[in-house]
Regions:
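Flexible cytoplasmic inter-helical loops of multi-pass small-molecule transporters
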Residues: 1-8, 195-227
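Helix-loop boundary and gating motifs at the non-cytosolic
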Residues: 6-65, 227, 231-278, 373
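Hydrophobic alpha-helical transmembrane segments
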Residues: 111-118, 122, 147-206, 270, ...
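Core transmembrane helices of Major Facilitator Superfamily
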Residues: 34, 120-132, 332-343
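Hydrophobic alpha-helical segments of secondary membrane carriers
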Residues: 26, 151-159, 241, 362-367
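C-terminal transmembrane bundle of multi-pass solute transporters/carriers
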Residues: 58, 67-72, 79, 85, ...
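Short hydrophobic/alpha-helical segments at membrane-entry points of transmembrane helices
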Residues: 23, 109-117, 237-238, 323-329
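Cytoplasm-facing, short amphipathic helices at loop-to-helix transitions on the intracellular side
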Residues: 19-20, 82, 133, 144-146, ...
Length: 416
């Protein structure tokens, strides 16, 4: 009786695990700054180019290194101290945001410079994301992994609410540059939390391996990881579903500046409200997974949210009413985060420790890399040719068709 009562408290993991509490607080504050930068960068790209294609291009360039290097980075993460890796890459993010602030503040920002800085950020992200994601189980243990992932998602979505709201005010009062400056400052919070974390030493099967051996064997290890993930079963089916959703479903977020301005006739403040609506929904979805929804059948929730997400994005593409768009984005946020948090947890729990870094590397390669490098680039090009509503609607329809087919042919997904 006690265990269910405890699990219904979505914040129990924060109370129980000091290391995760430090990580979560610092990460959430930093993500607020990151969402400010995301909103400001999309708006700045649109101002400098007046092109949906360029907005998609800026988003996609930062994802190219994630596609190219993620699996090698995952092999490196599996051989490394993950906490140290996260500390170093977060420091790189701080420097990148500071340079972006300085260039924009002095009026020297150009599309070319934005592309270069986005590429540098992508290189760091290729290493940081699998290290950070696979570190969560070390902070809380296997028993609390699912609620910890859900709470991590809740912090992400809390930041998506607060960050764009602050960004809208900052852009209006002080200009776009200060969004980048505040983001640079926010990385101080996450670095502070990371340096306070103390993790026990975990014996590595790669202990004693020299640095040059890590480099020369990373390709072999990356291929071994791919072979493991390609084995028939729930992991492969779920990764396929996640991949198609990330490439065709998620990139609608990249074109939100264009939809806000051209379809819904909103300014930067209105664009911030749209992103905040998505964040509020995501926060609710994450808390549902961390709390009461943890008692639902995971397979049924995966199926319901996996089908609802693209259907709601199709409805969003069709609307020209800002209030309806806000309501749809709220609903999209709920189902998108519920699906993502559940799929992330299922994948990690079904993958051995020695492959977990490479699993999360593949996950980040798809969610951050292919989603932006392929999905955002393609949807931006299509939007430039036929209109943003057709681009978003068609990509979501592809996602819906694939999800329907996958759930129909993989009944074991309903039993995870």
């Amino acid at each position: 009786m006690n265990a269910p009562d405890r699990s219904r408290n979505p914040f129990r993991v924060l109370q129980t695990h000091r290391n995760f509490r430090l990580f979560w607080i610092g990460q959430t504050l930093s993500l607020m700054g990151s969402w400010m930068q995301t909103m400001a960068l999309g708006w700045l790209s649109l101002q400098l180019s007046n092109s949906a294609f360029i907005v998609g291009l800026v988003a996609s360039v930062g994802a190219i290194p994630v596609v190219l290097f993620s699996m090698h980075a995952g092999a490196l993460v599996d051989r490394s101290d993950r906490l140290k890796v996260v500390r170093i890459t977060q420091a790189v993010f701080l420097i990148q945001a500071a340079v972006l602030w300085l260039l924009t503040w002095q009026g020297h920002a150009t599309i070319g410079l934005l592309l270069v800085l986005a590429f540098i950020q992508g290189i760091a992200s290729a290493v940081e994301i699998p290290a950070r994601q696979s570190m969560i189980i070390l902070l809380v243990g296997r028993e609390d992994l699912q609620p910890a992932i859900a709470l991590n998602s809740s912090g992400f979505n809390l930041a998506r609410i607060v960050g764009p709201a602050i960004a809208g005010l900052v852009i209006h009062r002080f200009g776009i540059a200060w969004c980048f400056g505040l983001n640079a400052l926010s990385f101080v919070a996450v670095l502070w939390g990371l340096f306070l974390i103390r993790l026990p030493k975990v014996p590595s099967p790669f202990a004693g391996t020299r640095a040059w051996e890590v480099i020369t064997t990373s390709t072999r290890d990356a291929l071994a990881g791919l072979r493991h993930l390609d084995q028939p079963g729930v992991v492969r089916d779920l990764l396929s579903l996640v991949s198609v959703g990330a490439i065709f479903g998620a990139p609608f977020i990249t074109l939100m500046p264009v939809m806000a301005r051209d379809r819904l006739h909103l300014d930067a403040g209105g664009y911030g409200v749209l992103l905040a609506s998505l964040g509020v929904g995501g926060l609710i979805g994450a808390l549902m997974i961390a709390g009461p929804a943890s008692h639902w059948t995971r397979g049924k929730v995966l199926r319901t949210t996996g089908l609802l997400f693209p259907a709601l994005v199709i409805a969003l593409a069709a609307t020209t009413n800002a209030h309806v768009a806000e309501e749809l984005l709220f609903a999209i946020g709920v189902v998108m985060i519920m699906f993502n948090a559940l799929s992330n947890g299922v994948l990690q729990l079904r993958t051995p420790e020695e492959f977990r870094g490479r699993l999360m590397a593949f996950y980040s390669m798809v969610f951050v890399g292919l989603s932006q490098a392929v999905g955002a680039f393609a949807i931006g090009a299509v939007a430039n040719a036929v209109g943003v509503e057709w681009a978003v609607g068609a990509s979501a329809l592809i996602t819906l068709a694939f999800a329907s087919w996958t759930f129909a042919r993989s009944p074991e997904l309903a039993r995870v």
